[in-house]
């Protein structure tokens, strides 16, 4: 079962800490109560608890991605956005999986599958017994579809000019 999907920022390797890892989007499937107290804490406290869990996963993904890039000897610009007509290769993108022990940060053990593309990290938080090959294909498909959709928002595309050409009377 997939427990969470998240998209977050990735800082380039070999750079000073110029910013924090930021979670741009997350979706948690199911709820986990705080391990300290079995009583209900209320919606706000549960939301903050889930937010902390997701941020912990994002930081670990960012750390592993930076480590992999540094070990491969990649330059600091490899994870920066590239506004060109060339498609982004998902097969060459840094990726990996790691295991989270029970209590770190989830109550049950989990597996995290991640993919780093440009300056974005995509991650799935899974049960430990999930099919990782199927999950990796799903994560790559999600990332490709999201990047294709977001390509409309890049500075290289002038949506206003395209709209004016398509609707000359307006």
UniProtKB/Swiss-Prot annotation:
Q: What is its main location?
A: cytoplasm
Key words, A-Z? Cytoplasm, DNA damage, DNA repair, Endosome, Lysosome, Membrane, Protein transport, Transport
Gene Ontology biological-process entries: double-strand break repair via homologous recombination; endosomal transport; protein transport; vesicle-mediated transport
Matching entries from InterPro entries are given as: AP-5_subunit_s1
- Asked if the keyword Hydrolase belongs to this entry, the reply reads no
Q: How does it sit in the membrane?
A: Peripheral membrane protein
- Superkingdom field: Eukaryota
Q: Name one GO cellular component term.
A: late endosome membrane
- In which compartments does the protein localize? Cytoplasm, Cytosol; Late endosome membrane; Lysosome membrane
Biological role: As part of AP-5, a probable fifth adaptor protein complex it may be involved in endosomal transport.
Subunit text:
Probably part of the adaptor protein complex 5 (AP-5) a tetramer composed of AP5B1, AP5M1, AP5S1 and AP5Z1. Interacts with ZFYVE26 and SPG11.
| Protein name as it appears in the record | AP-5 complex subunit sigma-1
- Its gene is Ap5s1
């Amino acid at each position: 079962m997939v427990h969470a999907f998240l998209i977050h920022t990735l800082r380039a390797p070999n750079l000073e800490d110029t910013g924090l890892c930021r979670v741009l989007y997350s979706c948690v499937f199911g709820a986990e109560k705080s391990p300290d107290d079995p009583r209900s804490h209320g919606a706000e406290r549960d939301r903050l608890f889930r937010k902390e869990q997701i941020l912990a996963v994002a930081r670990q993904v960012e750390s592993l991605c930076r480590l992999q890039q540094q070990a491969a000897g990649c330059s600091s610009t490899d994870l920066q956005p590239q506004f060109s007509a060339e498609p982004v290769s998902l097969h060459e993108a840094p990726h990996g999986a790691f295991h989270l022990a029970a209590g770190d940060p989830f109550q049950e053990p989990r597996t995290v599958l991640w993919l780093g593309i440009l300056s974005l990290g995509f991650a799935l938080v899974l049960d430990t017994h999930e099919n990782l090959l199927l999950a990796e294909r799903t994560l790559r498909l999600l990332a490709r579809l999201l990047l294709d959709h977001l390509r409309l928002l890049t500075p290289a595309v002038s949506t206003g000019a395209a709209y004016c050409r398509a609707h000359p009377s307006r």
